[in-house]
A protein has these predicted regions:
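Conserved catalytic cores of phosphodiester-cleaving nucleases, focusing on short active-site segments
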Residues: 144, 158-173
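Amphipathic alpha-helical segments of the small helical/lid subdomains adjacent to P-loop NTPase cores
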Residues: 1-11
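Accessory nucleic acid-recognition modules appended to NTPase machines
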Residues: 12-152
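Catalytic cores of nucleic-acid endonucleases
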Residues: 153-155, 168-207
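Structural signal for conserved beta-strand scaffold positions within catalytic alpha/beta enzyme cores
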Residues: 97, 116, 166, 185-187
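Short secondary-structure boundary/capping segments
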Residues: 5, 105-106, 175
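Short, basic/low-complexity N-terminal boundary segments at the transition from targeting/disordered tails
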Residues: 131-145, 164, 185, 196-199, ...
């Protein structure tokens, strides 16, 4: 568990053991938002700055439940472009969008929540908002979406196929998954699982 806590803060990136890790991570963020994405998407400099502003707004309120028009007004862009901007930021590995199961024209459901891509980014960008609940959900989604189709759950945190997952601490109860067809409680701060209870750290071992 101490090693897991260490990973949460600075274990995701290959340069995590560097003494200048925080400086390097912030350089990666700035390079990605201000140069890489604008060049890839053929954006001008001012639009690149708006992307950075958008990321900071998300970082301060994760898990972020987007109201697209309000968000577009804040950063001064057309609502029509906002979904594309978010998709660029997601593809660049800065955020992760959790969608519902409604599908749509692009084959993507409605975005229900936006997380930072991994827990290290929470410490780099939103340290003052690094609440433990958000940390747990971010880690679970970061690890499971690699090989699974993870969507938002109507009764809990996440849905993978017929399985429902509620994320919490060691005292988390079963109430929210009581009506789930196949429900699991994912608990932080425990080393071993039992019944339908699975330790959070276990999800870091699935690929």
């Amino acid at each position: 568990l101490p090693l897991f806590a260490e990973y949460i803060q600075h274990g995701y990136y290959p340069f995590s053991k560097d003494t200048t890790f925080e400086i390097e991570l912030n350089q990666v963020i700035n390079q990605t938002m201000e140069n890489d994405i604008p060049q890839y998407a053929n954006m001008n400099v001012s639009t690149g700055r708006k992307l950075k502003q958008l990321l900071m707004i998300i970082a301060k309120s994760v898990p972020f439940k987007p109201v697209m028009q309000k968000l577009a007004d804040i950063i001064g862009v057309s609502r029509n472009y906002l979904s594309d901007y978010l998709l660029y930021i997601e593809k660049a590995g800065m955020i992760a969008q959790v969608r519902d199961d409604t599908g749509g024209i692009r084959g993507l459901g409605k975005v229900e929540k936006i997380y930072l891509d991994n827990t290290n980014l929470i410490y780099a960008l939103g340290r003052e908002n690094s609440n433990i609940g958000n940390m747990r959900e971010t880690f679970f989604y970061n690890q499971m979406r690699v090989k699974q189709d993870v969507i938002s759950s109507k009764i809990s945190d996440f849905q993978i196929g017929e399985r429902t997952f509620e994320i919490g601490g060691k005292n988390k109860g079963q109430q929210q998954i009581a009506k789930a067809q196949e429900g699991y409680i994912v608990k932080d701060d425990i080393e071993t699982g039992y019944g339908n209870i699975i330790p959070l750290w276990n999800f870091g071992m699935n690929y």
